[in-house]
Every structure is written in structure tokens, then in C-alpha cells.
């Protein structure tokens, strides 16, 4: 009992120190937000319509960037699908260098993959048809399923901008 009486003040001071160091009251920690773009001082960051809507509007005003059912409970290949989606996005933005104006949307239906994006009209139609065939053929070979591109063209990248923040 004597031992506990001597130990109690030491434990109390340790608890007080730990409780003080665990709470952050700085303004830096309060400004952290996920899924929203931070406003710049000059308000020169362009946002598309899809980027301007916050994440809680998915299903109301905006949609998912990847449509697949393999990430559901007891699905066969959730991790492979996510890695394939990242690869497809990087491949499309690299192949269509500086031409993709929006986010790449991937839709998986049964055995087919449909890829949608907005492309700038900065190249000739002949080159555009070549890039469409090149992208579809290589992705079909690598993914072992039919891949189709659903592209829409815009005259300028500024046509896609919804607002500046």
C-alpha cells in the first residue's frame, strides 16, 4: 500500500503530460480536408464540372471515375482491377499527351472495358484515328478483353473549365 501511495503522484504527472501533448490546437491541423480543392490566392486554378463538385455529390451531380463490380464483397479480383485502372489512366494520358482535358472514366461491363474522356482538337483526324486504334489494340492485348474508346472532342482546353478557384 505504501508503494502505491508513492507511485500515484508520478503516474498523475505522466498522464497530465500525455493528455496535453495529444491534442493539437494549431490552425494547420484544422485546415485539412480531403476530396476538395483548396482555393488559390490568385484564383487561377481551373476546375472542370466534375472536379468542382465535392465527393458527397457522387451519385447526384457527378459519377464514379471507375465503374466495376469486382470490388464488391466476395468478388474475384478487386485489387487487380484497381491496379489495371491506374495503368489504363496512365497509358491513356501518356499516349494522348497534352490532349486529355478531363479525367479518364473507365466503365467495365461483363468482359468489355469502355474508356471515356474529353480530347482537345489539336491534331489532325488521321492522327486521332491512329491513336484510337493504337490505344484500343494495345489495351485489348494487355487486358485480354475488348477495349473501346469513347472520346469526345473540344476545341480548346478552356471550354472544359467550369470555374476557377
UniProtKB/Swiss-Prot annotation:
One of its GO terms (molecular function) is structural constituent of ribosome. It comes from the Eukaryota. It is found in: Mitochondrion. InterPro entries: Ribosomal_uS3m. It holds the Pfam family MRP-S24. Transmembrane segments: none annotated. The keyword Ribonucleoprotein applies. Residues 1-30 form a transit peptide. GO terms for biological process: mitochondrial translation. Keywords: Mitochondrion, Ribonucleoprotein, Ribosomal protein, Transit peptide. GO terms for cellular component: mitochondrial small ribosomal subunit. Belongs to the universal ribosomal protein uS3 family. Component of the mitochondrial ribosome small subunit (28S) which comprises a 12S rRNA and about 30 distinct proteins. This is Small ribosomal subunit protein uS3m. It comes from Drosophila melanogaster.
Amino acid at each position: 500500500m505504501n508503494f502505491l501511495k508513492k507511485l500515484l503522484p508520478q503516474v498523475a504527472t505522466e498522464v497530465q503530460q500525455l493528455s496535453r501533448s495529444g491534442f493539437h490546437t494549431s490552425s494547420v491541423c484544422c485546415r485539412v480536408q480531403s476530396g476538395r480543392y483548396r482555393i488559390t490566392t490568385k484564383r487561377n486554378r481551373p476546375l472542370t464540372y466534375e472536379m468542382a463538385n465535392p465527393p458527397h455529390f457522387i451519385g447526384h451531380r457527378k459519377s464514379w471515375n471507375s465503374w466495376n463490380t469486382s470490388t464488391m464483397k466476395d468478388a474475384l479480383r478487386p485489387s487487380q482491377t484497381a491496379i489495371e485502372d491506374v495503368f489504363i489512366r496512365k497509358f491513356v494520358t501518356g499516349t494522348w499527351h497534352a490532349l486529355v482535358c478531363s479525367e479518364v472514366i473507365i466503365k467495365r461491363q461483363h468482359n468489355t472495358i469502355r474508356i471515356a474522356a474529353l480530347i482537345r482538337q489539336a491534331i489532325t483526324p488521321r492522327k486521332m484515328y491512329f491513336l484510337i486504334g493504337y490505344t484500343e489494340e494495345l489495351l485489348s492485348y494487355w487486358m485480354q478483353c475488348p477495349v473501346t474508346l469513347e472520346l469526345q472532342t473540344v476545341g480548346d482546353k478552356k471550354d472544359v473549365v467550369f470555374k476557377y478557384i
